């Protein structure tokens, strides 16, 4: 197993890409701290992992709640919280340190797209801009900063930020989202440069369109789905498993010489 006994925090693990990464990390032997703003989503992810490990590794099923928004399972912990709240972000990291004494891997996946309505910069409501930045940029900063403090003490660590192809090639009329993911790309490079001497690797994954609950409203419209497929040379929509495979590689020792890299997983969308 490629992540055996590695301690990993995955934010936004209650659905979509985060759920796919959490599931794959568990199968690769990682011990997990999963976080999400939605407890119901975390419980669904827990059930999926419990079932998978029971089938593949003989782990007992079942996840029991405790106090303070933390849920416990034989293979890891769950923290209900919002990455845009500093105390919550720090509590996510502390859950790993408290239980296992270290944190090897952070996947900064929690994020939002903003309004479903196409908006240019001058028509974007200020509160929408601020909320997108608060989650997509400040949330990544808060979790990474808290994790790095522990990684500096232990002398190693790896961070995988989930950015977007939109951080490299902007989507039309999505100014807030594009800017937020561009910031994640730049922040990833800055962290990689600053902390390489401390043996902390930092990379980002830039997904194209991936089929999740967040994108379903668009992909459920047949004309839009086909338009996206036609714009993708590989000829299909991305899946959470595609991103999970990339995350496993970047988090594993196989990527020991990889830092400051933006791994685009988009079926060729940005080259067309």
Task: Give residue ranges: language-model regions.
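Canonical Rossmann dinucleotide-binding motif of NAD(H)/NADP(H)-dependent dehydrogenases/reductases
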Residues: 3-33
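Substrate-binding pocket helix/loop in short-chain dehydrogenase/reductase
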Residues: 75, 117-121, 125-130, 228
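Short, small/polar-rich loop/turn modules that mediate ligand/substrate recognition or access, typified
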Residues: 102, 196, 201, 258-260
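Short C-terminal tail/terminal secondary-structure segment
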Residues: 113, 117, 169, 248, ...
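Active-site helix of classical SDR
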Residues: 144, 180, 188
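Alpha-helical segment proximal to the catalytic Tyr-Lys
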Residues: 149, 193-197, 256
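Residue(s) in the substrate-gating loop at a strand-loop-helix junction
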Residues: 164
